[in-house]
Regions:
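Short, flexible/disordered intra-domain loops and linkers
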Residues: 83-91
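Extracellular/periplasmic catalytic domains that process cell-envelope and extracellular macromolecules
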Residues: 20-22, 43-47, 64-68, 132-142
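Gly/Ser-rich "nucleophile elbow"/oxyanion-hole loop immediately N-terminal to the catalytic nucleophile
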Residues: 1-33, 43
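Active-site nucleophile loop of the alpha/beta-hydrolase fold
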Residues: 53-60, 77-81
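A conserved short beta-strand
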Residues: 47-58, 71
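Hydrolases whose catalytic domains are alpha/beta-hydrolase-1, hotdog thioesterase
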Residues: 37-41
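Acidic catalytic loop of the alpha/beta-hydrolase fold
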Residues: 79-84, 152-154
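C-terminal catalytic histidine-bearing segment of alpha/beta-hydrolase fold enzymes
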Residues: 73-75, 101-197
Length: 198
């Protein structure tokens, strides 16, 4: 109830005179415990966010998992806590990815070979992996993972633009009955190129 009350209060108070918010583009992010909370809400309450992107903690399937589409990105550090530095061999990352791939309707494994896209974002993130779903002829990256080189359990400034570059392409609308419609835009909504996530 807190989330719904907070958003309702913000919608009532933010009228554009001081600030303006696009309530169709609410994103979740965080590091460490913040990442665990964000990814946890993505599992249990995906209706909170248009997309999530976080660093250094994962979530997995829970008893109250929603199994609904939620675009997600996770970055781990090469010297991070737990087993995350193991990458594809990490149990925590495997559990996170298994849930997220299933929730997003992608029938693939969390392996480098099964990733649909593999690219270098910058010198700290030379290996970014994406699992996509083709919707109306557009390859939509719904699950993305990267390892940040030489990073312990913290955030580097280079992590944040990567998370934003992922999340900014997604939006959502909530109908009166609570139905969620999600959108992906390759141009980050600068052009009329949005496709509905099905």
């Amino acid at each position: 109830k807190f989330y719904q009350s907070l958003v309702t209060l913000m919608e009532e108070k933010i009228d554009g005179s001081y600030a303006d918010l696009d309530f169709n583009r609410i994103y979740g992010s965080g590091q460490s415990a913040g990442s665990a909370a964000t990814q946890g809400f993505a599992v249990t309450n995906p209706e909170f966010f248009a997309a999530v992107g976080s660093t250094s903690a994962a979530a997995a399937e829970k008893e109250n998992s929603a199994f609904e589409t939620i675009p997600t990105m996770l970055i781990a550090g090469q010297m991070d806590l737990g087993d995350m530095p193991k990458g594809f061999e990490s149990t925590s990352l495997q559990n996170w990815a298994k849930y997220m791939l299933k929730a997003n309707g992608i029938d693939k494994e969390f392996t480098a070979e099964d990733a649909d896209q593999h690219f270098s974002a910058d010198s700290r993130h030379p290996d970014v992996y994406s699992w996509t779903k083709t919707i109306d002829g557009v390859d939509v990256p719904l699950v993305q993972w990267a390892l940040c080189l030489l990073r312990p359990h913290n955030c580097y400034p280079s992590d944040m633009p990567m998370l934003w570059d992922f999340m900014e392409h997604f939006s959502f609308e909530k109908a009166e009955d609570g139905t969620i419609t999600r959108y992906y835009s390759a141009s980050a909504f600068e052009r009329d190129d949005a496709v509905i996530l099905k």
